[in-house]
Amino acid sequence: MEARIHQIYTMMVIPRCSVVSWTSLKKLYLGDCALSDESMAAILSGCPVLECLTLDTCGELKVLDLSKSLCLRTLDIYPYSWVPGPTQILAPHVHNLILVINSQLACTSFDVSYLAEARLEICIFVLNNVEAGFLQDVVLKMLEKLQNVEKLTLGGNFLHILSLAEVRSVPFPKLKVKDLTLKTLIFQYVIPSIERLLQNSPDLKKLTVRVKSSNYIRDYALDDYLELQGFNPDQCWRSKDGVSFNKVGCSIEPKHVTSLLELVLKNTKTLDNIAVIFDERYPSFKLEEVVVPTLSHKNVSIALLYNQTDP
């Protein structure tokens, strides 16, 4: 019976210091759990061949130590706005990471020595000025830890916070990413971060932009923060060469897609493929209306697509 168990789903309060013996378990999902550090350690010790772990809205957990889980390769963590995730993660054997950061109590320390692929996003609905400053520090430290990751996916809220850091001229780490995916609407509030990410990814081969409504931070919150820092928002959101983009994501026009493609081509040297994949609600124009730019010294494949499966 135990040998046939490959996956367990549970939504409960896990008693402190629970003892389990799931010696054949390879995939574990824990959702809506009040999970202490001691309980998590006990569960992990009873799952010696665990390969995949998902923590979905697990409160109380502060330190997630996976250093003794030698077989663990995939880790997914999803907190919620009022249920923070762990603030310390030790996952030296994990190769694939999905991490959604809680805006109020984000993970500030993590070891992911052998990580090959990461997907990062921020769970936030209302941004205040204190969180804006705190999150900039958090996301930049995370990127620094992920310098050797070759496949990276960033969500719209994550890009917003990176844009604030770029406008303020905060240094960005260099990345070794070869395959970069951005899940965001195309509008002015993500342009500074996209431009800097491209410039700091000299080995980039493939860029995918999944145009979808995942940007939940309000534009006025971003503008208000910059004004308090002494910046003029109307001047901050342009690209380095002065190109202006749409202020509202749903008001995207063909020229804005063209401008984005031009920005990508100007800021990359090794890129082979660009794919811009639109959610079925965006855009309001036909993709044939987009003028696809070309550069004589670059041979880059550019594809504009609809309704691809979102992994």
Language model regions located:
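Non-core capping and flanking segments associated with repeat-based/extracellular domains
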Residues: 1-311
